[in-house]
Amino acid sequence: MEKGRIVYLNGVTSAGKTSIVEALQARRDVFFYVVANDLFQETIGEDYLKENYWKYLGEVIIMMYHTAKLFSDLGKNVIIDSILVEREGVAPHYERMKEILRDNPLDLVEVYCPLDICRQRNIDRGDRYETQSEEQAKLMSAGIQYSLRVDPKSRLMRTQTTQPLTIFS
């Protein structure tokens, strides 16, 4: 059985990852399931998150990668809507994710948005705090090998990939 493609959308909150997910899921020529930090975080009780946020979030993020791997192993395409941050519970995050998904077709997509725009989006949304994107940017994993970079100015800029990501055309 051919493995499904995994597309990892990596970026700070309010960069536009979920909007990209919605656009991809609206297409009729390719089908993707979605796993996301926000969805998996909801599996953790609030009291546990208050007690030790990164411990429990770290565990569920790793489970999310195993879930994406399962979809791919079953021949299903899947999008990961997340952010690669280096925090206790997941560090070394980027390396752990690569190890879990090493045998699966993986494209890492940097979803870039200027932090001042993210800040304004956070304010407008009201469900994020104003500086959340800046704080996440400081924690992002370094040295990530992206397949593509998506940003609001140039729409799409290829950096490197073994197979073109035609889903973004």
Give residue spans per PLM region.
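Small-molecule kinase domains that catalyze NTP-dependent phosphoryl transfer to phosphate-bearing small molecules
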Residues: 124-168
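Pre-Walker A (Motif I) flank of P-loop NTPase domains
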Residues: 2-6, 76
